[in-house]
From Swiss-Prot:
Cofactor note: Binds 1 zinc ion per subunit.
Name of the protein described by the UniProt record: 5-methyltetrahydropteroyltriglutamate--homocysteine methyltransferase
Binding site for L-homocysteine: 440-442, 493, 608
Active site: 706 (proton donor)
């Protein structure tokens, strides 16, 4: 008999209970004990649900209060100096100091948070472990064991999930730039201890996540994997299920298959080609976990096709006794339960599956494999019907959108003049000071803003009253920015609920959920739109409020749009068309909006692409094609303006070195990037030398907005001085790392005042009186 299993379940709860508990704790309204009890209840509910769905191997230690990579760092004592940790179990205040920084308004006493970056090619963010060259590791507390015992007390024998030692090190950074893998022998005793204690407790299986197997690995990394698992195998351990996901294991398969582990998990949604070579080479006693249900998207599985794949594997293995049926990856990346969605279009709803439904699909496939098609005939018929109605829907496939795509030409992707010529015309139109100051876009969305939006949604206020409130907040924001002294203003985006949802709600082809939340980082949750059909813009989306804001001030106000690649990346995308095609549909819709903003008098239009690198395939061989169409889509959306209109863009935390040619080819007039946590390290990619230098203007973030800490003026000035060493003065803008929507005005006003003050001091240094 096969085993239905899961690699991980969403942490946040059906109603975002984790978010509520965390934010209450941070506000001083919930004790540490209360927070831990809320977490315990969430874990119990998750395990009960999975057991009820027929999941045989239920994961534990897939839950984290903030981030599972941070949990691993805390477990092995990888705490940087300065956070007050002196050994022993890491306290909750220290844990949150690492995650969020400390100090608040007391900047002098504050500590910065750990650097944050994207988890592979997803929109989940992890905290980057910071290691010393001679890092000492020690188990501070065996959290996997504690959570195994917690579940065991509820009569559930779970399979703990650990981030594997090699992936942990490759996801980390060292203070001196040395190779983290050099620390492997120091780290392995911690893993050996954790595994031995789990084995002694009667734990049968442990899931070891080594997602770096989906990357192009150097020989040293492959050798590290062999050394790590051979070392661990010499000790007392439960059976290990080695899990990789997000891309094919491909040329790392010989390494994975040679490791002394009891089982191997394959992502057969993104790595279907791995199956045949694994079936041909897998050991006679090794278990195989088949990731047949997409753990990263919301579409219902093709149960008949999945069952056929499971049968193929069973035939090759001589039966289903060594097979596990699973999602492709952790279900962290999808919403919890479709059953909560009572307002979805009834035509679209049958095409979808969230985490709960996906585990039901997993259990159904396992049952069909073991008992035959007849046992799941009703489920197979429902799956077939959903696929058929989606394929044949005239709402999904629109002839007008197809015709416009066919009519798009390469000329539509080219600006009239090169950047140098455009820069002169833009500066003539907007004579800004050296080191101009601005923000990235959004301003704090206070409880009053959220209450007003909710009141409109509930029908408690009308559109006129809502619009009056938005107009008031917008004018207040303009006046505040003028008083602070910012050079280029934003309207604040008070009318926007989310930088993707706001646009998707006004575009054809998008659907929205009420409870479709997924974790981005910590307590930050997003509800991605679902792109279910061809995309088109029925009417202008942002022009009204942009025009209104510009009418209130003589200073330039930026038009603010979310770019086509980010709209794609931060949505659940239809899987019946190539992603490139969907992105071009979005680009054409945004092109019309860009043209309308320019016609409304906006001199700067910012088209944000924070997810541009996030879409980069994990495998090098696949990247050129992605970058080609991603750049093409950005240019298709933006190359509609005159030379004296500036196109800005913004990108979030990422490693830019390997995509710099593509970023330059986007042909934006200015780019802002998140650099505060890395202390301008990311600027190295943009500085370059000669032809490799980024040709346009750059705004390196000087204030980490993901932390409540207020950076002092001296700190911002120091970062700007670092930036001046890498960039020409006429390239440098001064701005925060990201939008300010999630911060409050008590943090934002003094931080912006410090930012403007630092820019003025920098001007004085650069241009002495």
């Amino acid at each position: 008999m096969s085993i239905a299993t899961s690699l991980g379940f969403p942490r946040i709860g059906r109603r975002r209970e984790l978010k509520s508990a965390l934010e209450a704790h941070w506000a001083g309204e919930l004790s540490e004990a209360g927070l831990q009890e809320a977490a315990r209840l969430l874990r119990a509910e998750s395990h009960s649900l999975q057991q009820g769905l027929g999941i045989g191997h239920i994961p534990s230690n897939d839950f984290a209060l903030y981030d599972h990579v941070l949990d691993t760092a805390c477990m092995v004592g990888a705490i940087p100096p300065g956070y007050g940790w002196r050994g022993g179990e890491v306290t909750l205040p220290t844990y949150f100091a690492l995650a969020r920084g400390t100090g608040g308004g007391d900047a002098a006493a504050g500590l910065p948070a750990l650097e944050m970056t994207k988890w592979f090619d997803t929109n989940y963010h992890y905290l980057v472990p910071r290691l010393a060259a001679g890092q000492h590791f020690a188990v501070t507390a065996n959290r996997p064991l504690a959570l195994f015992r917690e579940a065991l007390a509820r009569h559930r024998r779970t399979r703990p999930v650990l981030l594997g030692p090699v992936s942990f090190l490759l996801l980390a950074k060292t203070d001196d730039g040395s190779d983290p893998l050099d620390l492997l022998d120091r780290l392995l005793p911690c893993y050996a201890q954790v595994l031995a204690e789990l084995a002694a407790e009667g734990c049968a299986w442990v899931q070891m996540d080594e997602p770096v197997l989906a990357l192009d690995l150097a020989p040293k990394a492959r050798a590290a994997l062999r050394h790590a698992y051979e070392t661990l195998a010499r000790g007392a351990t439960p059976r290990l299920l080695l899990a990789s996901y997000f891309a094919p294991i491909a040329d790392n398969l010989p390494t994975a298959l040679a490791l002394p582990v009891a089982g191997l998990h394959l992502d057969l949604v993104r790595g279907r080609d791995d199956l045949a070579p694994v079936l041909a080479a897998i050991g006679p006693a090794t278990w195989l976990s088949l990731g047949l249900v997409d753990g990263r998207n919301v579409w219902r599985a093709d149960l008949r096709a999945a069952l056929a794949t499971a049968r193929e594997a069973a035939r090759a293995l001589g039966g289903s006794e060594r097979l596990m049926i699973a999602p492709s990856c952790s279900l962290l990346h999808v919403p919890v339960d479709l059953a909560q969605e009572d307002r979805l279009d009834p035509a679209i709803r049958p095409w979808l599956a969230f985490a709960t439904q996906k585990l039901a699909e997993v259990a159904t496939i396992a049952r069909g494999l073991d008992e035959g098609e007849g046992a799941i005939a009703e489920a197979l018929e429902a799956s077939d019907a959903a696929l058929r109605t989606r394929r044949d829907s005239a709402r999904v496939h629109r002839t007008d959108v197809a015709a416009r795509l066919l009519g798009a030409t390469p000329e539509m992707e080219r600006r009239p003049a090169p950047h140098a010529a455009r820069r002169a015309r833009q500066r003539q139109r907007l004579p800004l000071p050296a080191f101009p100051t601005t923000t990235i876009g959004s301003l704090p969305q206070t409880s009053g803003v959220r209450r007003t939006r909710a009141a409109l949604a509930r029908g408690e206020i009308g559109a006129a009253e809502y619009d009056e409130a938005i107009a008031t907040w917008t004018e207040d924001a303009i006046r505040l920015q003028e008083r602070i002294g910012l050079d280029v203003l934003v309207h604040g985006e008070f009318e926007r609920n989310d930088m993707v949802k706001y646009f998707g709600e006004q575009l054809d082809g998008f659907a929205f959920t009420r409870h479709g939340w997924v974790q981005s980082y910590g307590s930050r949750c997003v509800a991605p739109p679902i792109i279910w059909g061809d995309v088109a813009r029925p009417r202008p989306m942002t022009v009204r409020w942009a025009r209104h804001a510009q009418s209130l001030t003589a200073r330039p106000v930026k038009g603010m749009l979310t770019g086509p690649v980010t709209m794609l990346q931060w949505s659940f995308v239809r899987d019946d068309l190539p992603r490139e095609t969907v992105c071009r549909q979005i680009a054409l819709a945004l092109r019309d909006e860009v043209a309308d903003l320019e016609a409304a008098g906006l001199a700067i239009i910012q088209v944000d692409e924070p997810a541009f690198r996030e879409g980069l395939p994990l495998r090098t061989a696949d990247r050129e094609a992605y970058l080609r169409w991603a750049v093409s889509c950005f240019r298709l959306a933006t190359a509609v303006v005159r030379d004296d209109t500036a196109i800005h863009t913004h990108m979030c935390y990422a490693e830019f070195q390997d995509i710099m040619p593509a970023i330059a080819t986007m042909d934006a007039d200015a780019i802002s990037i998140e650099t505060a946590r890395s202390r301008m390290e990311l600027l190295e990619a943009f500085a370059g030398h000669g032809p490799s230098a980024y040709p346009a203007e750059i705004g390196p973030g000087v204030w980490d907005i993901h932390s409540p800490r207020i950076p002092p003026e001296e700190e911002i000035l120091a970062l700007l001085r670092l930036a001046r060493r890498k960039l020409a003065d006429d390239q440098l803008w001064v701005n925060p790392d990201c939008g300010l929507k999630t911060r409050n005005w008590r943090e934002v006003i003094p931080a912006l005042e410090n930012l403007v003050g630092a820019a003025r001091r920098l001007r004085a240094e650069a241009i002495p009186a």
